[in-house]
Design a protein with these regions (language model features):
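Active-site and NAD+-binding cores of ADP-ribose-processing enzymes
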Residues: 24-117
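Long, hydrophobic N-terminal alpha-helical segment
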Residues: 1-29
Length: 117
């Protein structure tokens, strides 16, 4: 599974919250590579958020994502961010036959601002 976000800012935040707090130190944040990809819209499905409104839990989202991945209904699936619920992440299934349609548009170094720690 390739985890992407609808914006660079969301991708950075999603990554940042996964860094253990004891590793968040000035001048020690990781240098990453920001990659912008072009994916045809018709290859991305939107997740039915209403089905999870009651619980909106990580296990529920994972189960739904696993079902989508195994079924190979689409190359991509838009899912709500657990960090900012009004924003969307996009899961890409690298085993899907349409994966060759994904193009890398930009690839550049990404640095976290030390003021985040």
């Amino acid at each position: 599974m390739v985890y992407t976000a609808s914006s660079l800012a969301l991708a950075a935040l999603e990554y940042f919250v996964g860094i253990p707090s004891h590793l968040r130190k000035p001048n020690e944040l990781p240098v990453l590579t920001a990659v912008a990809m072009e994916v045809p819209d018709h290859l991305i499905d939107a997740f039915n958020v209403a089905s999870l409104l009651e619980s909106y839990g990580i296990p529920d989202c994972r189960l739904a994502g696993e079902g989508w991945s195994v079924g190979q209904r689409s190359l991509g699936l838009m899912v709500p961010s657990q960090v900012i619920r009004r924003e969307m992440n996009i899961l890409l299934n690298p085993a899907h036959p349409d994966m060759p349609h994904v193009q890398v548009a930009v690839s550049e170094p990404f640095f976290f601002d030390d003021r985040l720690v």
